[in-house]
Amino acid sequence: MSKHPSRFAVAGVSHHTADVLALEAFRFGDEPAFLAAAQKKFAGALLLQTCNRVEVIVEGDAASLRDFLESQERKGFFLLEGREALRHLFSLAAGIDSMIVGEDQIIGQLKKSLADGEAACTASPFLSLCINKAVHVGVGVRRTTKINRGAVSVGSAAVLLAESELGTLEGRHILVVGSGEMGLLVAQALAAKHLTAMYVANRTFGRAVILAEKIGGVAVRMNELYHYITLSDVVISCTSAPHPVIHKTALKEAMRDRCWPVEGHPRPLILVDIAQPRDVEEGAGAIDGVRLFTIDDLRQVNEQTMSTRRAEAERAAEYVDDELDLFIRQLHRKSADDCIAALHTWAEAVRVRERDRALARLGNMDERTAGVIDDLSRVLTKKILTDATASIRACAEEGDRDAAEALVRALTRGSAADSREGTE
């Protein structure tokens, strides 16, 4: 299928349009199964799922994408097509659309989305081109602006939130649940806070050990989780588990062990859940002494960050627009080349056929005469195609692919278009 902006569409939900409950409801738990279903409907499909967005990226039209998502029982999603979809993708890679403006993690997340699509054989060449261009734009924005200068990630924003609630984290005991990329970001943000102790829990104990050694913490087995919750002032949970790992009943028991000897009330526990889907079972925030925060609560951190980087975000948006214009011109130029190549391939076949007919009618002749006739046929074909080629290129480069293809069909009576479709 031809590379053309109109064949690019994006749909989904993000922190702009949905709260944590809606994000969780929209997620696709079985990514391979989703991609397999999408493969039957589109020339290419990718799935981008992070803690604050779920987006489906396809080579196809917006109407088909809407119908497909509705068939998957999804609703309330945004839907973009063509230029606006590409602008969204580039802005996303640039960090402009992120909850934490300028954060760098989205670059890796886009690369992972493409890698997962390639593994599932759903990443078409066109989608690969678009994602790689978006990554290029994201890197360029960070190189030419200060949008990520002093930027915080979602993980470090969670640490800032906890710090704002307690006033300081110095001397505190902190438990990090999860040792993946987000867990590493959280741990790195905590490393400079002069903690008394940092604990790291993970389903795979070996990974907890590796992260704990990196940041001078203590690795914790998951069967000891609630004991260390009892010891901690703050718990930040960021696993990739498909189900809650901190349960309401067990947490309630742990909070009883935190009670002050005289007052009988538990010591307050700051519990920050930045996982998607959520790590903390619903209702845990109602337990006496528990102050539960989720992705939704990180918006206030983003507002503070954005106010100091608004000028850089504007510069980044200008960079995105310039790169978008360049990319679309390249796509249109490629589209023009495809149309012109189809026309010239058809014309060459006609030239050779008619030349051979003429030579056959003329009968025996010397090599020089045959060469003159061949040269004549080439010159005539070139002259006939000159104006047509210019018109086709003008239409395609202006984005009017339909008009360019109509010209090719009119000149070739459909033969070139048919042969080109068979090779795409």
Swiss-Prot record:
Pfam families: GlutR_dimer, GlutR_N, Shikimate_DH. NADP(+) binds at G178, S179, G180, E181, M182, G183. It catalyses: (S)-4-amino-5-oxopentanoate + tRNA(Glu) + NADP(+) = L-glutamyl-tRNA(Glu) + NADPH + H(+). Its EC number is 1.2.1.70. One of its GO terms (biological process) is protoporphyrinogen IX biosynthetic process from glutamate. Signal peptide: none annotated. It comes from the Archaea. Transmembrane segments: none annotated. Keywords: NADP, Oxidoreductase, Porphyrin biosynthesis. Pathway: Porphyrin-containing compound metabolism; protoporphyrin-IX biosynthesis; 5-aminolevulinate from L-glutamyl-tRNA(Glu): step 1/2. One of its GO terms (molecular function) is glutamyl-tRNA reductase activity. Homodimer. Possesses an unusual extended V-shaped dimeric structure with each monomer consisting of three distinct domains arranged along a curved 'spinal' alpha-helix. The N-terminal catalytic domain specifically recognizes the glutamate moiety of the substrate. The second domain is the NADPH-binding domain, and the third C-terminal domain is responsible for dimerization. During catalysis, the active site Cys acts as a nucleophile attacking the alpha-carbonyl group of tRNA-bound glutamate with the formation of a thioester intermediate between enzyme and glutamate, and the concomitant release of tRNA(Glu). The thioester intermediate is finally reduced by direct hydride transfer from NADPH, to form the product GSA. NCBIfam families: hemA (TIGR01035). Catalyzes the NADPH-dependent reduction of glutamyl-tRNA(Glu) to glutamate 1-semialdehyde (GSA). Belongs to the glutamyl-tRNA reductase family. This is Glutamyl-tRNA reductase. It comes from Methanoregula boonei (strain DSM 21154 / JCM 14090 / 6A8).
